[in-house]
């Protein structure tokens, strides 16, 4: 019988922050309670309106209210803090609301970021999967009125929900019946067993590729956090038999087909590694950490899919950085060398600690700027 590694043995992280990572990975994120779905007859959808708290935090008012104007608590939007939350409705004229004589499934706030839509935007769709025969129309809010990400429509297509059954609600609207499922997941906080239902259903519609070992690269990704030096990591994994993939150059179906077929998945932590929600139970996952702060959402996903996971420090940042802002310096670290030695990978020891001068200069230049530089290249 093969003995599984303990959590501490899975961490190839600098000693001074290892306990922080260990705590994140030892946390139990699963909630055992049953989920429910509120059914609201002749209820109203109130598009979110922005409000500013006394401390400056921005939040929303809106959601679902019943035919007496009472807020339906299960329609709230909560991400662990008041910023961006939607916890109550607001006064409105029932007589002026438009009426749609259809039954709809409430999807909540549509987050126009692929990674966040992936793990948050489908958290109510467990009920859709369990009740496919109802052929629901679905309703979402788009409070920032941004162009909807193409992956949203790809998800709807794979689920079998046509565009004419998707409603982005922008004015107060009454519906014959609104189904309001509880969320199956709160980012970085908890998940229910139903969390994986939409992903399992989507995955069942797509044939797996015989991809064995894959590396999800960011080197051709021109948005999001600036990461410099990943080409060195990519080279290491390519030389050790991993197929290099560039997710942003693939359709969603193609990405899922590779994830579904892979026995081992490696990559710098981010949206691409969150795609492991489509992986098989027990898949090996090698997460290359880009900061000294653990991303609890990845630990949550690992628990949900029972991953054979490893967390490997790959950042060369001379100063503390914020995961979602950067800039990030990546390279071949002693941590990666330690993982390679343990798992039988070959690595060029001469490259340990190497950073291109141009990357170092760019890091310092951007780090000292007092403005956001997330999308600078």
Locate the predicted segments by residue.
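The feature primarily captures lumenal catalytic ectodomains
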Residues: 1-376
